[in-house]
Amino acid sequence: MSLSGSFDTMPLPELLSWLDTTARSGRLTIDSLRAGTTLVVDNHRITGCQSSEPPTLLGQFLLFHGAISEETLQVAMREQDRNGRRLGEILLDGGSISAEVLDGFLAAKAEETILSTFDVADARFDFDGDTRPPRGVLPVSMPIHFVIAKGLRRIEETAEAALFLEQRGQLLRRTDRRPSPRIGAVWPLRQAYEAVNGARTVEEIALHVHGTRAQVLQRLYELYKEGYIELATPERSVALLLPPSILEEPLTSINVSAELPSLVPRRIADDATALNSVERYLLSRCDGTKDVRSIAMVAPIRPWEVADTIRSLLSRGLLEVGRRPAG
C-alpha cells in the first residue's frame, strides 16, 4: 500500500505511528524545500536512512564534532572527486580517523538524520512498499516508537531554546564569565561558544559550526542557561580588517561561470546589513585565500547554492574574484 500527503494533513509523529501500528514495510520519502530524506521502514523499525541536507552529510557531521579539520575534508573530497570512493573509506585509508571512531560517528549520524526530520514543519511525504534500500543508504536499527518519543522531545526542546534565544532585534554575545573546562573539552559546545560574537543570528552560527539548527540551539541554550552567553541589542558593526589582496588580475566581469570554481573570491565591502544568513556566512569565508571549489567543499550548503550566492555577491560589488598568482 502506498500513501502520499503533507505534514499539514498528517504530521510526522502521526505518520510514523501509523507505520508502526500497521507494521508497514517500505520506503518513506520526505521532501521539503531544504532537503530530501528517505527512511527505510521494516516491521516496527527504521532500518536505513539517507538525506541530502548538508549538515547531516558525513563530512559536515564530522566537522561539527571536531573529528576532522576543514583541510582534511577538502583533501578527502578532492580525492573523492577523482576516484568516486566513499568519503569514509578515504578518511580511513588516509589515517584521518580510526574504524572504531568512524563506526561510532556513523551510528550517531544515522540517528541525527532520522531525528532531523522532526525539524521540518512543512514537507510532503510518500510511502511505498518497496523495501529495497536505495543506493548509499546508511543502515540503522531504531524502533519507531523510540524515534517518535525522541523526536517529540526534540521538538519541545528546540521550541523552548528558540523562545529564549531568537528574540527580534537582539543577538547573542558572550558574557564576562570565564568559560568552564567542559566548554573547552566538548568540541560542539566550544565551537558554538566561539561562534557567538554579538553579530550573528542562530542560523549563521549553525553555518559556522556545521550543525543543524536543532543541534546548535541545544548547545547555545546550555551556554545561555549557565550564563556564558546573553542576548543584547547589536551594536554598529566594526569595519572588517581585510588582508592585502593576493589575487592576480582581479576580474570585474560577471560572466565568470565556467571559470568560477577555480577563482579566488575576496570580500571588498563591509556593509552586510541587507544580506541573509547564507550570504553573510559565505562573505566571511571569502578572504582571498581559498578558491570557490574549496569553499564549497567544506560549507554546509549545497555546491550550486554556494556558486549562485557568490555570483550574486559579485554582481552587487561585495566581492572581487581573481586567479591565484602563478608559482
Which residue stretches match the model-derived regions?
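Acidic, Ser/Thr/Pro-enriched low-complexity segments and adjacent helix/loop capping patches
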Residues: 1-327
